[in-house]
Every structure is written in structure tokens, then in C-alpha cells.
């Protein structure tokens, strides 16, 4: 039966129409409000930027007549030379601020909170947010003042005083003072804070005291890296982090945190408290930045892409601007015109690139492992065909390593011969250690009949690691040694390191022109949280490291490091695998990308100001 349209239906439809109109008007009003808020925020940001520019002009001693410009005609004073290269870039005819710089990490970052993070990835982010007293010229390697405007060193080398610049502020607008520098050391050294690695690194400092604009670092004894240690210490704001020292409970709150990150650097977190593992790592330009030149990019972003193939796809699709290629990829990509037309390749040995290694754990769950025997460790090195890894997996873009020291510098012992692949020698050493094939099943066993079998733990998602470990599995079995690959996600791997819960592990250490191996080889660093996670203890090595560390004269120090190198070469606590070339592509819209003595001039390293930029006509991202 057909229903007639009645009066009450008209009333109902009219009521519904009124509701819809009200909703539409409300949405329109909300949209206008959001637009107003966005405009207001833009004005606030612009005013904050102008104030920061005015502050920079005042610091330069400029006469404030006429409009403020990023690059004026002033000559940089000596105490602002850290910004000389960035200042030169800002004077280029096509220079412009804006756009985003997007990179990627091959693993998920577990925490961005200072002192709690022990991985390279979190450090890369922190360097853009947290300032240091000094920085370094990437071409000359000369130390330059940054937050400090000058320094003085006592004749005995035990006291270093830095004078902090006037008028500096953190990204929340609060002033940065010498007291914040002193607080940063006291915060880190407080036993309530879970920072054993950093406490070990800064253990030579006996006190840090502020007096006006001066802050003085006092050392217990001479140490060759004293100036670098003091000058590169992260400067934390006391007003933000100080509350976490109030009690054990507040310290535990800090220790459990993942995203407490606030500083005075050229970039800042959108929120300095809310970041969690799995979130996009996104920094925005610090509009209150005090430096001579402000940050060129509007945003600095890192994506977590844990599969190599996915990283390459993201790079080819333009989703990331800087891509570190695997050797096989690089060989093919540099011949791909579609890639090179949009991205510029760079190939170089980064002095800070460090080395890849296999570390042999000597004590697990309170019991000695087979790797507690030096002969077993040496046998494993003979079974590791490192030249084949370099040739077949790394396509020749690497050097075989025979120790922790940079072979391009003075610290490496030039008289040490790199062990070559030798199955017969490995079998002989294993037999000396009591491992022979007792039941003729092709596997060597101990005197108790226990097969020599273990797992190698390594980061999952990396094809290079996977290929290396699978090759080693085939090589080791030639001597009757059974190895099982154990790929794990980065947070799981960090937990295994902290708990010393692994048989063997393959990772990398960053390097430098001269490094200190106290952190990962001294017996004292086997404590929980220390970086001697393989439980290797050698009093002879401890003494050599200590002697080298306290020798201030480089000509006398290098022979001591050569002795350290010789002992590590003999003991083989690690099997040092290789030092890779950096094989990097950067989007061609990014200008002023160069290879310097310190590597690619990406900025951030040693808190160096960013020198890259994108001309306005080539920018692809906006706010």
C-alpha cells in the first residue's frame, strides 16, 4: 500500500535539514577557526624567527638599520668560525631556506632520551637537537668554538675552562648558561640515572663547576681526549631535566622514558616529551636558534625502514633524500641513468665509519664459553674468509680489518699481518684447544663430547649481514664447527647486549682518526650496561690502554697504541671483519653536498652546522 506524504513528515524532514545545516555551519566555523589558528601560529613563528635573527645581529655587533638579512656583508669574527662554511653557503645566489630533508634508519630506534640511548641512530638525531661547547671543521679538523666563545687549558692539562656565549637560549626560550653545562655532567654522573656507558666515558672528569659565564672541567690525570670529551659533552637544560634527580622515583621515570629530548640546537622535537618507538622521527626548525646562520631545512625527518629492499624502493620513489646503498646496489645504481639523473652518487672512506666485527662472548649465564679459549677465537678468525666477503659480497667497496684502529691514521700498527683464510690452521688450533671429531660425524667435539656449536646474533632486515653470516656458516662447517644464524630486531639485539645473552654477535663500531678502546675492551667495562659485553678481561691490555690514554704527547702515545693493537691481534676477542666504503646518494635538488676529510658534509657530526640547502624553485615540501 502506498503511503501518503503527511504533515508530520514535512516537519521531520525540515528538522533533519536544520540539523544538517547546523552541522555544516559548525564545520565551516571550525574550519575558519583552524585557519585562524594556523595563521596565528605562522605569525608567531615568523615573529620568533625575526627575534632570533635580531638576536643573531646583536651578537654580531651589527647596526640594526634596515631589514635583517640571513647573510649580510659582515666578516665572521674568530669566535664564530664554526659557522663559516654554513655562512658561505647562505651567500650563494640560489640559497633558500625551506623544504624537508628526509633520511632513513635500517632499524627502529628504541629511545631518543639522552644518555639512555647507546646506538648510532639515536645519536644522529640528538646531535641536531642538543648543542655542544665546540665543533670541528670537516675539512681541516680544527676545533672551533660553538656554544663556548673561547677556552683555556692549564699547563698540566688537568683543567679546561670554557666561556659560554651570552644571550643563548634553549628551544623553549629559556636561557642557556654555564650552569646548564655543569648540570649536564652532574646529571649524567648521578647513579640514579641509567647511564653507565656515559659515566664510563666521562670517568676521568672529577668535577665540573660553573662561575658566571665560565665552566671548568677538572680531570684526575692527563688524558689525550680531555678537550674533546669536555667540549663535545651534550648540554642539557637544567629546568627541563633537573626534576628527574629529585628522587629515585623521578629518576626511574627518566630511565623508562623514550622521548625526553630538549636542547638548544638548530632543530627541535615537535613535542620534547611524547615520542615513542615506532613513531616517525620528525624534527622542526628551531626558530629560537642562536647560531650565526639558522637551519636551512624546515624539517629533518628519519623513517624507520627495516628491510633493505624497501629502503631502495622508497629512495627510487623519492620518499627519502639520502640513501646509503649496499655495494651490489651501488654498482648497478651508478649505471642507471634514471637514478643518476635525479641523485648524485658519493663514494668515500669515512674516517668515522668504523668497522664491522664478530664479538665472541666468553662468559654466558655464569659459565665460560668455548670462546674463553684464545685458540678457539683465533681459529674462528682463520675460518672467516674476510677477503672473500669483501670481494663477493661487498664488491670490493671495503678493506679487510685486522683491528679497531683506522689504517689510514697513525694509530694502527703497520707491522701486523692480516690473517688469511686457512682451514688447516684453524683445525690445528681447535685440536690444541681439545676440539676434534671424536665420533667421525664431521663435527668437532670437546673432551666431554659437546659439539662446537653456537649462534651468531645480528640485526635482522639487512641483506648484507644475512649474506655474510650464511657464507660464514658454510665456511665454518669445513672445520667441523656448527653455526646457526640468529637475526633479531634492533630492540631485542640491544637487550641481548645489555644482558650479555648471546654466543657471538656481529655489529659495528663507529671510528675516528684516533679512538679509545677503553670503553669496549677494558676489564672494568664488563659491569652491567658496560660496552665490554663479551666479558673479556686482560690485565696486560688494561695497563697498555691506561698508559696510552694518559700520554698527552702524540709521538709517545702512538707506540703505546701499537702495542694495544698487537695484543688485540694476538688475542682476537673480536674477529675484525671489514671497513666499508660509504656509498651514498643524495637528491640532486640538494645543493652544496661535498666530501671532506671528515666524510660527507652532512652537518650534525660534532654538532657542525648544516651546509646543504635546496633552491626555492626546486623545493618539493612545504609546511
Give the predicted meaning of each segment:
Residues 15-24, 60-72, 77, 81-85, ...:
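Detector for C-terminal structural segments
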Residues 43-50, 149-194, 213-218, 311-314, ...:
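Aromatic- and charge-enriched surface segment that lines or borders ligand/interaction sites
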Residues 94, 163, 198-247:
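Surface-exposed binding/hinge segments that line
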Residues 107-123, 147, 174, 226-236, ...:
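A structural "hinge/loop" feature
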Residues 124, 131-142, 234-294, 299, ...:
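Gly/Pro-rich hinge or "lid" segments in bacterial periplasmic/extracellular proteins
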Residues 188, 207, 270-282, 303-367, ...:
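Extracellular/periplasmic solute-recognition and catalytic clefts
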Residues 255-256, 287-334, 474, 482-484, ...:
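Ligand-site clamp/hinge motif
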Amino acid at each position: 500500500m502506498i503511503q501518503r506524504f503527511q504533515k508530520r513528515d514535512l516537519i521531520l524532514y525540515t528538522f533533519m535539514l536544520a540539523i544538517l545545516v547546523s552541522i555544516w555551519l559548525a564545520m565551516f566555523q571550525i574550519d575558519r577557526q583552524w585557519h585562524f589558528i594556523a595563521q596565528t601560529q605562522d605569525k608567531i613563528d615568523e615573529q620568533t624567527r625575526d627575534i632570533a635573527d635580531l638576536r643573531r645581529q646583536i651578537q654580531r655587533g651589527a647596526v640594526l638599520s634596515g631589514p635583517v638579512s640571513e647573510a649580510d656583508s659582515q666578516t665572521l669574527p674568530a669566535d664564530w668560525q664554526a659557522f663559516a662554511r654554513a655562512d658561505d653557503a647562505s651567500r650563494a645566489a640560489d640559497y633558500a631556506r625551506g623544504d624537508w630533508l628526509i633520511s632513513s634508519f635500517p632499524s627502529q630506534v628504541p629511545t631518543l632520551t639522552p644518555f639512555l640511548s647507546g646506538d648510532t641512530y639515536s645519536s644522529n638525531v640528538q646531535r641536531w637537537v642538543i648543542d655542544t661547547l665546540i665543533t670541528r671543521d670537516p675539512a681541516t679538523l680544527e676545533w672551533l668554538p660553538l656554544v663556548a666563545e673561547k677556552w683555556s687549558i692549564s699547563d698540566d692539562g688537568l683543567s679546561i675552562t670554557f666561556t659560554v656565549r651570552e644571550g643563548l637560549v634553549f628551544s623553549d626560550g629559556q636561557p642557556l648558561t654555564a650552569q646548564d653545562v655543569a648540570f649536564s655532567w652532574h646529571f649524567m654522573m648521578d647513579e640514579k640515572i641509567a647511564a653507565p656507558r656515559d659515566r664510563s666515558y666521562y670517568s676521568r672528569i672529577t668535577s665540573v663547576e660553573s662561575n658566571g659565564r665560565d665552566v671548568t672541567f677538572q680531570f684526575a690525570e692527563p688524558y689525550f681526549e680531555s678537550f674533546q670529551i669536555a667540549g663535545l659533552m651534550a648540554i642539557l637544560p637544567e629546568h627541563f631535566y633537573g626534576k628527574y634527580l629529585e628522587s629515585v622515583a623521578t629518576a626511574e621515570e627518566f630511565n623508562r622514558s623514550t622521548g625526553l629530548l630538549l636542547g638548544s640546537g638548530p632543530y627541535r622535537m615537535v613535542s620534547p616529551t611524547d615520542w615513542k618507538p615506532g613513531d616517525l622521527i620528525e624534527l622542526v626548525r628551531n626558530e629560537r636558534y642562536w647560531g650565526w646562520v639558522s637551519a636551512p631545512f624546515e624539517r629533518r625527518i628519519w623513517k624507520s625502514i627495516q628491510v633493505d629492499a624497501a629502503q631502495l624502493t622508497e629512495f627510487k620513489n623519492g620518499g627519502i633524500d639520502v640513501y646509503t646503498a649496499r655495494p651490489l646496489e651501488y654498482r648497478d645504481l651508478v649505471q642507471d641513468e634514471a637514478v643518476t639523473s635525479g641523485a648524485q652518487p658519493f663514494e668515500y672512506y669515512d674516517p668515522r665509519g668504523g668497522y664491522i666485527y664478530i664479538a665472541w662472548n666468553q662468559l654466558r649465564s655464569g659459565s665460560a664459553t668455548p670462546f674463553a679459549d684464545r685458540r678457539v677465537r683465533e681459529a674462528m678468525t682463520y675460518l672467516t674468509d674476510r677477503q672473500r666477503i669483501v670481494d663477493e659480497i661487498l664488491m670490493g667497496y671495503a678493506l679487510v680489518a685486522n683491528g679497531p684502529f683506522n689504517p689510514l691514521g697513525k694509530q694502527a700498527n703497520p707491522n701486523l699481518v692480516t690473517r688469511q683464510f686457512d682451514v688447516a690452521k684453524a683445525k690445528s688450533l681447535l685440536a690444541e684447544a681439545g676440539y676434534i671429531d671424536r665420533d667421525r660425524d664431521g663435527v668437532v667435539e670437546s673432551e666431554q663430547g659437546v659439539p662446537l656449536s653456537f649462534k651468531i646474533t645480528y640485526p635482522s632486515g639487512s641483506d648484507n649481514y644475512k649474506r655474510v653470516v650464511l657464507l660464514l656458516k658454510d665456511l665454518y662447517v669445513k672445520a667441523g664447527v656448527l653455526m646457526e644464524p640468529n637475526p633479531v630486531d634492533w630492540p631485542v639485539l640491544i637487550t641481548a647486549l645489555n644482558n650479555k645473552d648471546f654466543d657471538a654477535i656481529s655489529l659495528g663500531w663507529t671510528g675516528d682518526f684516533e679512538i679509545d678502546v677503553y670503553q669496549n675492551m677494558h676489564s672494568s667495562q664488563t659491569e652491567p650496561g658496560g660496552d665490554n659485553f663479551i666479558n673479556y678481561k686482560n690485565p696486560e691490555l688494561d695497563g697498555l690502554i691506561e698508559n696510552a690514554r694518559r700520554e698527552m704527547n702524540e709521538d709517545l702515545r702512538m707506540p703505546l697504541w701499537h702495542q694495544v693493537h698487537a695484543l688485540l691481534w694476538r688475542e682476537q676477542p673480536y674477529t675484525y671483519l671489514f671497513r666499508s666504503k660509504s656509498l651514498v646518494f643524495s637528491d640532486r635538488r640538494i645543493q652544496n653536498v661535498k666530501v671532506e676529510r671528515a666524510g660527507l658534509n652532512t652537518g650534525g657530526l660534532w654538532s657542525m652546522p648544516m651546509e646543504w640547502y635546496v633552491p626555492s624553485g626546486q623545493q618539493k615540501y612545504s609546511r
